[in-house]
């Protein structure tokens, strides 16, 4: 979309004026969608400052960003469960949808039908924790990032959430614990993706060699 292009360009150029223009457009869209404009701006600023490696401004916003995510998390699992039950009822009413899918695709559809909101929030918590691990040396903030990575795992135990937890732990000097979590990421990683496997193995070697 135009918004994503504008944001990507602002990050690439580290251009605050372009980013402010993007915020104005998003404020208009978010208002029309009934979203909390102020909260959406905090999240956008946090992501932008992390992307352009503005450590100080990112650190100031990280906790506020997390608070917004925790607020958004309320009742999201219930809503996802309701959507999942509705999805199953629709399958029962019209089983022709099953016949047209391969078993693998059907399994994928069923798995993701019940985690729409929670998976999206999980990745938001994960990205926030990953940005803290990458940019910050603030011990208190890193401690909080452990909680955010764990929250991501609770919402949706994707392998990248374990990978992020390992990175936070490693940044804090917990080599053994980081190794355990990176090994979990390796176990949960989808089979057959050589690029992902190489990335995780590279991080495992880094932790083992304490580089």
Where are these regions (language model features)?
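Oxidative protein folding and maturation machinery
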Residues: 1-211
């Amino acid at each position: 979309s135009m918004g994503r292009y504008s944001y990507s360009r602002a990050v690439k150029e580290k251009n605050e004026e372009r980013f402010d223009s993007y915020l104005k457009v998003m404020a208009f869209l978010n208002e029309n969608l009934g979203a909390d404009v102020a909260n959406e701006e905090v999240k956008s600023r946090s992501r932008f400052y992390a992307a352009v490696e503005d450590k100080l401004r990112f650190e100031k916003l990280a906790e506020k960003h997390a608070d917004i995510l925790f607020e958004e998390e309320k009742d999201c699992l219930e809503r996802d469960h309701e959507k999942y039950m509705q999805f199953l009822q629709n399958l029962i009413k019209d089983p022709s949808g099953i016949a047209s899918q391969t078993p693998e695709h059907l399994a994928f559809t069923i798995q993701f039908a019940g985690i729409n909101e929670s998976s999206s929030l999980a990745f938001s918590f994960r990205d926030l924790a990953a940005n803290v691990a990458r940019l910050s040396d603030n011990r208190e903030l890193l401690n909080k990032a452990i909680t955010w990575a764990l929250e991501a795992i609770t919402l949706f135990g994707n392998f990248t959430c374990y990978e992020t937890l390992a990175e936070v732990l490693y940044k804090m000097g917990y080599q053994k614990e980081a190794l355990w979590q990176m090994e979990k990421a390796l176990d949960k990683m989808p089979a057959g993706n050589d690029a992902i496997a190489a990335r995780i193995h590279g991080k495992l070697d880094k932790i083992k060699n304490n580089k």
